[in-house]
């Protein structure tokens, strides 16, 4: 089974009810195409996932509602990847962005069951324009948010509040012996742009990092907490 709740096409959740999902053998929720949570949704509770809690091709978009992902998730909490053709090439389609887009709602994630797990993991961009996030990255090598591309954070659709606790230490998995990476609050392989938001990143784990950006980091807004931004060029204009 690919997931407890699985669709070959896109998956949209709406309505005022609560959805409880337990993925005993693989992902809890998965779709080959995009996954979208409408504003009307009350709550999605991932009670267990043997792999990712939420896994989607094309992109993931959260417009509202509450998403709770517990510590029993074995891999990533929310992962978006590109949809590939039969030759493993990225399908050229405007919807095939590999992105995670959050416009509102509440996302609560605890990463403590597996090393090298991520709260939000996108092959494309992570774009946040509203919402409340609380992510506890407790396992070794875990990351609160990680993108292979760029991350943009603002408050264009709703108030944005992000709190990430990076309490884990180095990943000790055998396959990562050559690169025993640290626990991090945020890891951005491209550029990070923060236009407006309240962000608190606490890197209290041994050698844990707050925010790591390989590209250029541009900040306009309010950033709170203890953390470091490294491996990038930093332009910071912080208004108190």
Locate predicted features.
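A composition-driven surface/loop motif
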Residues: 1-240
């Amino acid at each position: 089974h690919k997931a407890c709740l699985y669709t070959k096409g896109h998956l949209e959740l709406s309505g005022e009810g609560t959805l409880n999902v337990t993925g005993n053998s693989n992902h809890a929720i998965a779709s080959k195409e995009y996954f979208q949570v409408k504003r009307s949704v009350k709550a999605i509770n991932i009670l267990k996932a043997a792999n990712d809690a939420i896994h989607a091709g094309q992109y993931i978009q959260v417009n509202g509602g509450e998403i709770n992902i517990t510590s029993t998730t074995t891999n990533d909490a929310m992962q978006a990847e590109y949809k590939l053709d039969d030759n493993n090439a990225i399908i050229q389609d405007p919807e095939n962005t590999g992105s995670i887009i959050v416009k509102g709602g509440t996302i609560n994630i605890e990463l403590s069951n597996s090393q090298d797990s991520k709260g939000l993991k996108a092959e494309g961009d992570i774009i946040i324009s509203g919402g409340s996030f609380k992510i506890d990255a407790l396992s070794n090598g875990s990351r609160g948010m990680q993108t292979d591309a760029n991350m943009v954070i603002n408050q264009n659709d709703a108030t944005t509040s992000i709190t990430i606790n990076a309490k884990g230490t180095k990943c000790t998995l055998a396959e990562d012996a050559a690169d025993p990476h640290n626990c991090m609050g945020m890891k951005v392989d491209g550029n990070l742009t923060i236009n407006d938001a309240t962000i608190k990143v606490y890197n209290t784990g041994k050698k844990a990092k707050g925010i790591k950006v390989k590209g250029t980091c541009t900040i306009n807004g309010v950033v709170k907490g203890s953390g470091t931004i490294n491996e990038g060029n930093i332009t910071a204009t912080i208004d108190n």
